[in-house]
Design a protein with these regions (language model features):
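Right-handed parallel beta-helix
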Residues: 318-329, 361, 381-392, 404-419, ...
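Short, surface-exposed beta-strand/strand-loop-strand elements in extracellular ectodomains
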Residues: 759-771
């Protein structure tokens, strides 16, 4: 090799002399890289050793470099904090040309944070366990974060029953841009004086929260008066009227149970805060374990951190990637209309913006819009959001509404958003580029369309995949975690959604109101209370979507009339398959107008009310439901031309291999499982209804009447269950449990019994059909529960292992004349000292 070195140098020199243009061309095609660091300066050249300080400077430098760039451009962003006081905007001038790509990425192993918040420091004790700190801010504060935990606006705690409306507010059509119709609503709401303390300070910051079956609405107050034994909360107008002008009893109502927010007089619980705008002071009651002298406290100030905004159709923002970045602490102070504030909707992640027809279908949803988000995009193509973190938002996480093409939202960790984690599309996309004839006699015309003709396009070919989405919609509980309106060729795959207050995944829009049918009850499509808004003009924009291999655990934790996966409207060619849904109301819910959808090989594990819901109302039709694996045989399926075939009931979640494979493949794929924080504690279903102290240290346990038993009780004969002595028992002729035991270690089975059974009971206990013990119950421990331990001989356990544990079947069998097995109040496996 040493002898050949001069020849190599010579050849290299000759090539360089002969082909200088080739070397220059090769040099130009290498990716060009800029660097950003919190300790840099925007006066620097943006190199590794002299980085920029802001993303805006890097964007501008990239924009200048684009015309001469022959290859991809990289912007590497060092770890640290980047305060965002004004939204960072990328437009069509920031596109990568042709097949090139511009990537804004975190430096390897580092975590750059773009924050819309400011620190709140100098906390001092106030009184009654309340602390206070200065905050220079002119607007009210709806969110505060203490040691990464969301604090709660001071509130009434319990729901207060409204006592009816007060006064009259009159709207005349055309009096303002928001006044589309004439009408009258209440000008205020009455409450019993006995239900609330007297609120005297910063009245305009007080809010009413109104919960309906499937959503929540918020409206501001302008004045509080007292009349006899009633408080009169006078609404901020016109939004108070707009919130009442919502159909289907989904808006602000006058006699429902409500919660009052944001008054110092209501500050009385740990985790609550109140911001006094006049005094510019934040008040907070610490939660257990919080030290306000060392706590990290953040108040949000910026509503949107990143905006990607091309020119619709003609000049989209193209070929950008944002990777490994963190976005957090965004603000949202409700929608402002003519000085009034509120956020109200009929359903899911959109907002009513005008006093219009309560039947929003007649307006073609023109009075509704999407909401703000930490990241907003419009008119983009080939954009990728990958492995980013979004947290602690005042409203939504990501909103991409109009003209979204070939976008990938993959591998992101989005948590603790105020509203939806991801919203795609827009409710007004019923038709693209509406023509003047698309006007109902009682509705708004195209002059109220958000998207002028020639600028409107529904999302096409969008991938939402491998995102970890826990604990979202924290403020606006009616927002679905992933919300997709009208879309085509959209894939929602391998996402893990945990703890959704309403529906986890919402796909589609329009109900049956735009299917083109001129009547109500169609002979093949089924019933509906109303004809299509535009007979003979069906919407045809949506279809060929897929919702597959998602893991959805604990949806519908607060609201009702939704499910793990929920669909609306016509979307032929759409497939919902291989999803694992656990603990919800309805597993899959094909609601009004759902048409041309195949639901296949989904797993629905209890508790739930129904596996699948698709009734015969709302002209939903031509639906397939096939190959499901479920724990309880409870369905509501009566829509026309709907086929239910080859479904398997698996009581107690004893899954066959095919179902186990679906569960294993659902949620995050192996490449993306590292986006879950190492300290993340997934929800433990088994602990529901179980005394944590009793279960401490157990390798496995089963308690009657709880999820821990439902997944372990594999068979039973003559079984009975019910309450006794403050707990739930199970007894019967035979009970079989499949339990987990440690491998190669001593262990014992422990059963909890009542020590004062009225009749003598005698039964045998087997482990894998080998006799373990004989138990007799009578009155050995009067008036109390007791635990009986049964040491497990190692030879009784199977040789096959599952990691560090193995499974065995515990069978309780009553002896002749033994009465019954049990009552059994709990069963657990405990390790023994080795």
């Amino acid at each position: 090799m040493i002898q050949n070195l001069p020849l190599a140098i010579c050849c290299s020199t000759l090539i360089g002399m002969a082909c200088p243009s080739l070397l220059a061309q090769a040099e130009q095609t290498l990716p060009r890289e800029f660097f950003v660091s919190p300790t840099g300066s925007d006066a620097n050249p943006g190199t590794r050793s002299s980085p920029f300080q802001t993303l805006e400077k890097a964007r501008d430098s990239v924009r200048a470099a684009i015309p001469s760039a022959q290859g991809d451009i990289m912007v590497t962003i060092r770890g640290g904090i980047y305060p965002v006081r004004k939204t960072i905007v990328f437009n069509h001038q920031d596109s990568a040309p042709g097949k090139q790509r511009i990537t804004y990425r975190a430096a390897a192993g580092e975590k750059p944070l773009f924050t819309g918040g400011v620190p709140v420091t100098d906390w001092k004790p106030y009184k009654d366990g309340i602390w206070k700190a200065p905050l220079d801010r002119s607007e009210k504060l709806r969110s505060l974060y203490v040691d990464e935990s969301r604090a709660v606006m001071a509130n009434s705690g319990k729901k207060i029953r409204a006592q009816g409306g007060w006064g009259t507010y009159t709207v005349t059509a055309g009096q303002a841009p928001w006044a589309w119709q004439s009408g009258q609503t209440a000008d205020g709401i009455q409450y019993n004086v006995s239900d609330l303390p007297k609120i005297t300070h910063n009245i305009s910051d007080v809010e009413i929260e109104n919960q309906t079956t499937w959503n929540k609405n918020f409206v501001g107050i302008r004045e509080i008066a007292t009349e006899g034994d009633k408080y009169i909360f006078k609404l901020q107008q016109p939004y108070g009227a707009i919130a009442q002008q919502i159909g289907w009893d989904a808006g602000l109502t006058l006699k429902s149970e409500q919660i009052i927010h944001n008054a110092l007089e209501l500050l009385d619980q740990p985790g609550e805060f109140y911001f006094d705008r006049d005094e510019k002071t934040v008040y907070y009651i610490p939660r257990a374990g919080q030290n306000m002298q060392t706590a990290k406290v953040v108040a949000p100030v910026t509503q949107t951190l990143l905006q990607l905004e091309g020119k619709p159709i003609k000049n989209r923002l193209r070929n950008l990637t944002f990777e490994g970045l963190s976005f957090a602490y965004t603000d949202y102070n409700l929608m402002e209309i003519d000085g009034s504030h509120g956020t109200a909707t009929l359903q899911t992640a959109c907002i009513n913006t005008a006093f219009a027809n309560p039947n929003w279908h007649y307006d073609v949803y023109r009075s509704y819009d999407v909401l703000p988000a930490a990241i907003i995009a419009n008119a983009v193509e080939g954009v990728e959001l990958k492995r980013n973190t979004i947290a602690h938002t005042g409203c939504q996480g990501i909103v991409m509404s109009n003209d979204i093409h070939d976008v990938r939202i993959i591998g992101n960790f989005i948590r603790d958003t105020g509203g939806s984690a991801i919203t795609l599309g827009h409710p007004q996309h019923v038709y693209e580029n509406d023509t003047p004839d698309l006007k109902h006699p009682e509705g708004a015309g195209i002059e109220h369309e958000k998207f002028p003709a020639g600028t409107e396009s529904i999302p096409h070919r969008v991938l939402i995949s491998n995102n970890f989405l826990p604990d979202n919609s924290a403020l606006f509980n009616g927002h679905t975690i992933i919300t997709v309106f009208f879309s085509k060729h959209v894939k929602i795959e391998h996402n893990w959604i945990e703890n959704a207050p309403y529906t986890a995944i919402h796909l589609g829009w329009g109900w049956c109101d735009f299917d083109g049918y001129e009547g109500t009850n169609h002979p093949q499509w089924g019933k509906a209370p109303r004809p299509s808004v535009f007979p003979g003009k069906p919407t045809s924009v949506a279809g060929n979507n897929r919702v597959g291999a998602n893991r959805i655990e604990r949806s519908m934790t607060i609201l009702d009339d939704g499910g793990g996966i929920y669909t609306l409207g016509r979307q032929p060619g759409t497939l919902i398959d291989r999803n694992y849904i656990r603990s919800t109301t309805f597993g899959v819910y094909n609601d009004e107008g759902s048409t041309g959808i195949v639901n296949r090989a989904n797993i629905v594990q209890g508790p739930y009310q129904r596996v699948h819901t698709t009734g015969d109302h709302g002209r939903k039709h031509d639906i397939d439901i096939e190959g499901y694996y479920v724990t309880d045989d409870v369905w509501f399926v009566s829509s026309p031309n709907t086929r239910v075939t080859n479904n398997t009931i698996c009581p107690n979640a004893v899954w066959p291999p095919q179902a186990q494979a679906i569960i294993h493949e659902s949620g995050l794929e192996p490449e993306y499982r590292n986006i879950v924080p190492a300290d993340w504690q997934p929800y433990n279903f088994d602990l529901e209804g179980v005394d944590p102290e009793w279960a401490t240290g157990a390798v496995d346990f089963a308690v009657p009447g709880t999820p821990s038993e439902s997944s372990r009780l594999v068979s039973q004969k003559g079984s009975q269950t019910g309450p006794a002595n403050g707990r739930i028992f199970r007894q019967g002729d035979e009970l079989c449990y499949r339990m987990k035991f440690p491998v190669g270690k001593k262990s014992q089975l422990v059963a909890t019994y009542w020590g004062e059974e009225g009749n003598k009971r005698r039964f045998r206990i087997y482990i894998n059909d080998q006799l373990l013990a004989t138990q007799e119950l009578y009155q050995a421990h009067p008036g109390k529960f007791f635990d009986q331990a049964y040491p497990i001989p190692p030879a009784m356990l199977p040789a096959g292992t599952h990691g560090e544990t193995t499974y065995a079947v515990i069978r309780f069998t009553v002896e002749p004349d033994g009465g019954t097995v049990g009552g059994l109040f709990g069963l657990k496996v405990l390790p023994l000292p080795q």
